C-alpha cells in the first residue's frame, strides 16, 4: 500500500494526454503514508478556487479536509487517515465565481446506488482471479479466422427475480453464463455497466466511468462474473461510451465551475441525446478516456470494447442542422481531434493487451474503420455492419410476394462484405421505439413469422462476418425489449418458441464446428456466388470456403413460402452432396421438407459451373449442403 501522491512524471503525462493509467494516482486510494493507513484523494480541477473532501468520515463538513493544489498542475490532493474502504465521499468545489459545486469523483471505483450519488472508497486489488488459462490463451488467439457468436445482454432486464429485483452479478455469473454456454455463444456483450443515474438511458448516459454500476453488486462481484465467463470459455465485451456524458449535476458537467470535460461552445458541446460531448482539444480528457479503456482491460480482464456512437465522434455536424455546429480549422465537418483520439486509443489498447476486440458502432460510410492507423485507418479491428442490418431487416419485413422486386436489398451487402472486418448485428437498437421485436417484424401468419426468422438466422450464419444477437431473439420474444422487466421466459412453455430456441442452439453449434462458415470471413476466397440472380423466386445460392479453399459449404436461402422441387444449382465438383443443416425440420417448427437422401451429381453445366445437382428447397428456409469426399 505505497503512497499514491501524484509524481511529477504522472502529472506531466496526464497533461500531455498520454497517461494511460491515470486511475492509479487520481481518485481515492487506500494506502499507507508516514506509517499511517488512510486514503489519498486526488482530483483534477484546475480552475477551482478551493477543493475539499467531504464524506462519512468527517460528517460531510468541508472545513475539516481541504485539499492542497500541487503547484500549477490543476491537481488537488490530500491524505485522510480517518478514511477507509467503504466510506462515502464527494468533492466540495469552490469555484472562482464564488459558488460551490458538490461532485462525485470522476475516477471513483464504486458509487452509491441511484438515486444517491456519493462515491465510495474502494480497493480493486483484493480479488483472486481464476482465469489464467483464458488469459494465457489470448496471447496467441486471434478471432479473424475463428467463430464469433456474440450474445448481447442488458443485465437489468435479461431476467428478474419474482419480486422484480435485479439478479446480482454473482447470480448472473451462474444463470446467464450457464445459459449462454448451453446456447453455444462464445462472447457476451454487455450494454454499458459503468454507473449511470437514469435506467431509461440503458447505461449510455454515464456519470462515473470507473465505477461498475452498484445496481447488481460490488466491483468484486463483477470480477467474479467475468471470471466465471472466462472459466466457461466465454469472452466479455463491454459497450463503452467515450463520446458524451450525462449532464447530471454531480457528474462531469462544469466540474470545477468551468467547462472542463466538455467544450465551452454549446455548438460543440450539445448533441442529439441531450448529453454533453467530450472536448477532445483537452489532453487531460484523452488521459481520462484512454485510461478508462485500459482500466477495463487491466483491472476487469475484459476481452473487448464495443465503442458506441463513433459517428458522433467523427463528425462535428452529426445530428445537427446549419448553424448548430462549428467547422474545423479547414472548414470541414470532420472532428480532427476526436479522430486522432480514436487512432491513439486503438493503438494503445493493441499495444497494451494481446488480441483485444475493438469494435466500432459506426453507421456512416467513413472509410478504413478497421484498418490500422499507419495505413490511414481508425485502428479498430471490427465494425458493426449497419448497412447489412438495415437492408436485411427492410427486406425481411416485406410480405414475401413483394420481395422479388427488392432482391438487391438481399444481395447488396455482398458487394462490400470484405471492405471492413464486419460484425453482423441484430442488436437492442432494432427491437425498441416501435420497431417491434424481430419475430413480430416478420410478415405472414404465426407459422410464417417463425419460419421467416429461422430463415433470417440461417442466412446470417452463412453471410461473411461475425454474428451478434440481442437477448430474447433466440427464443422469439414477441413484444419489444423493455428495460423495466425481464424477458418473457414463459414463452418457452409454447412449442414454437421452444423449437426456435432449439434451432438457434443447434445452428450455433453447427456454425462453430463448420470451419467454412468462418475461416474465410475476411478474405475474398472465403465466399463465392453460385446464383445471386433468382429474384423471381426470391432464392439466393452461394458457397463459403475454408481458409485454404479445400473445403466448402453450399448455402441456399428461400425467402418465399413456396416449396421448390427439382431446383437445379451449379456445383464445382462431380461429387455426391448431402444436406447437413435445414431450418425447416419439424423439430425446429418447420414443415419437414428436406433432402433426406444423398444427392447425385449431374454432368449438366449450370450457373457457369461444370456440374449441377437437383434439390428440394423447403418453404421459407435456409439449407446447407456439403460435398461427400469420395
Swiss-Prot record:
One of its GO terms (molecular function) is hydrolase activity, hydrolyzing O-glycosyl compounds. Keywords: Carbohydrate metabolism, Glycogen biosynthesis, Glycogen metabolism, Glycosyltransferase, Transferase. SUPFAM superfamilies: (Trans)glycosidases (SSF51445), Glycosyl hydrolase domain (SSF51011). The active site is at residues 308, 361. It catalyses: Transfers a segment of a (1->4)-alpha-D-glucan chain to a primary hydroxy group in a similar glucan chain. Pathway: Glycan biosynthesis; glycogen biosynthesis. InterPro entries: A-amylase/branching_C, Branching_enzy, GlgB, GlgB_N_E_set_prok, Glyco_hydro_13_cat_dom, Glyco_hydro_13_N, Glyco_hydro_b, Glycoside_hydrolase_SF. SMART domains: Aamy (SM00642). GO terms for cellular component: cytosol. The keyword Transferase applies. GO terms for biological process: glycogen biosynthetic process. Its EC number is 2.4.1.18. The keyword Glycosyltransferase applies. Belongs to the glycosyl hydrolase 13 family. GlgB subfamily. Monomer. Catalyzes the formation of the alpha-1,6-glucosidic linkages in glycogen by scission of a 1,4-alpha-linked oligosaccharide from growing alpha-1,4-glucan chains and the subsequent attachment of the oligosaccharide to the alpha-1,6 position. This is 1,4-alpha-glucan branching enzyme GlgB.
Amino acid at each position: 500500500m505505497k503512497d499514491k501522491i501524484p509524481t511529477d512524471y504522472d502529472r506531466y503525462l496526464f497533461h500531455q494526454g498520454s497517461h494511460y493509467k491515470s486511475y492509479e494516482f487520481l481518485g481515492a486510494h487506500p494506502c499507507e503514508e508516514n506509517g499511517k493507513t488512510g486514503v489519498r484523494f486526488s482530483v483534477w480541477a484546475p480552475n477551482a478556487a478551493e477543493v475539499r473532501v467531504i464524506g462519512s468520515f468527517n460528517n460531510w463538513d468541508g472545513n475539516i479536509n481541504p485539499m492542497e493544489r500541487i503547484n500549477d498542475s490543476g491537481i488537488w490532493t490530500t491524505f485522510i487517515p480517518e478514511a477507509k474502504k467503504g466510506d462515502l465521499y464527494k468533492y466540495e468545489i469552490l469555484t472562482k465565481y464564488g459558488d460551490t459545486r458538490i461532485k462525485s469523483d470522476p475516477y471513483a471505483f464504486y458509487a452509491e446506488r441511484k438515486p444517491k450519488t456519493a462515491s465510495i472508497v474502494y480497493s480493486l486489488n483484493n480479488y483472486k482471479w481464476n482465469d489464467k488459462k483464458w488469459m494465457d490463451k489470448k496471447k496467441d488467439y486471434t478471432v479473424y479466422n475463428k467463430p464469433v457468436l456474440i450474445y448481447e445482454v442488458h443485465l437489468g432486464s435479461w431476467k428478474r427475480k419474482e419480486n422484480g429485483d435485479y439478479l446480482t452479478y454473482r447470480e448472473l455469473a451462474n444463470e446467464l453464463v450457464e445459459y449462454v454456454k448451453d446456447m453455444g455463444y462464445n462472447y457476451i456483450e454487455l450494454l454499458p455497466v459503468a454507473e449511470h443515474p437514469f435506467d431509461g438511458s440503458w447505461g449510455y448516459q454515464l456519470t462515473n466511468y470507473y465505477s461498475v454500476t452498484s445496481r447488481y453488486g460490488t466491483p468484486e462481484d463483477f470480477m467474479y462474473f467475468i471470471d466465471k465467463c472466462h472459466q466457461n470459455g466465454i469472452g466479455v465485451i463491454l459497450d463503452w461510451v467515450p463520446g458524451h456524458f450525462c449532464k447530471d449535476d454531480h457528474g462531469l458537467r462544469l466540474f470545477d465551475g468551468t467547462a472542463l470535460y466538455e467544450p465551452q461552445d454549446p455548438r460543440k458541446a450539445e448533441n442529439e441525446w441531450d448529453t454533453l460531448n467530450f472536448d477532445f482539444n483537452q489532453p487531460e480528457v484523452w488521459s481520462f478516456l484512454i485510461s478508462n479503456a485500459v482500466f477495463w482491460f487491466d483491472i476487469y480482464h475484459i476481452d473487448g470494447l464495443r465503442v458506441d456512437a463513433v459517428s458522433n465522434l467523427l463528425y462535428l455536424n452529426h445530428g445537427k442542422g446549419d448553424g448548430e455546429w462549428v467547422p474545423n480549422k479547414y472548414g470541414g465537418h470532420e472532428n480532427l481531434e476526436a479522430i486522432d483520439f480514436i487512432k491513439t486509443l486503438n493503438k494503445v489498447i493493441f499495444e497494451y493487451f494481446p488480441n483485444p476486440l475493438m469494435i466500432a458502432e459506426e453507421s456512416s460510410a467513413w472509410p478504413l474503420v478497421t484498418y490500422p492507423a499507419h495505413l490511414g485507418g481508425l485502428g479498430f479491428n471490427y465494425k458493426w455492419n449497419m448497412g447489412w442490418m438495415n437492408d436485411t431487416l427492410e427486406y425481411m419485413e416485406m410480405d414475401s410476394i413483394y420481395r422479388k422486386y427488392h432482391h438487391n436489398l438481399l444481395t447488396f451487402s455482398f458487394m462490400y462484405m470484405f471492405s471492413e472486418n464486419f460484425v453482423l448485428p441484430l442488436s437492442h437498437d432494432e427491437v425498441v421505439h416501435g420497431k417491434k421485436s424481430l419475430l413480430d417484424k416478420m410478415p405472414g401468419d404465426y407459422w410464417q413469422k417463425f419460419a421467416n426468422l429461422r430463415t433470417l438466422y440461417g442466412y446470417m450464419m452463412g453471410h461473411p462476418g461475425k454474428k451478434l444477437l440481442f437477448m430474447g431473439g433466440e427464443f422469439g420474444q414477441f413484444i419489444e425489449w423493455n428495460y423495466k422487466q425481464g424477458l418473457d421466459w414463459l414463452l418457452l412453455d409454447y412449442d414454437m418458441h421452444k423449437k426456435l430456441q432449439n434451432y438457434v442452439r443447434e445452428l450455433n453449434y453447427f456454425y462453430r464446428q463448420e470451419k467454412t462458415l468462418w475461416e474465410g470471413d475476411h478474405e475474398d476466397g472465403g465466399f463465392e456466388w453460385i446464383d445471386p440472380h433468382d429474384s423471381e423466386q426470391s432464392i439466393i445460392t452461394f458457397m463459403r470456403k475454408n481458409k485454404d479453399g479445400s473445403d466448402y459449404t453450399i448455402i441456399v436461402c428461400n425467402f418465399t413460402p413456396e416449396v421448390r422441387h427439382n431446383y437445379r444449382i451449379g456445383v464445382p465438383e462431380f461429387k455426391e452432396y448431402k444436406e447437413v443443416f435445414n431450418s425447416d425440420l419439424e423439430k425446429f417448427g418447420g414443415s419437414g421438407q428436406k433432402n433426406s437422401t444423398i444427392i447425385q451429381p449431374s454432368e449438366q453445366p449450370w450457373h457457369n459451373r461444370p456440374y449441377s445437382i437437383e434439390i428440394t428447397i423447403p418453404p421459407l428456409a435456409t439449407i446447407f449442403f456439403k460435398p461427400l469426399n469420395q
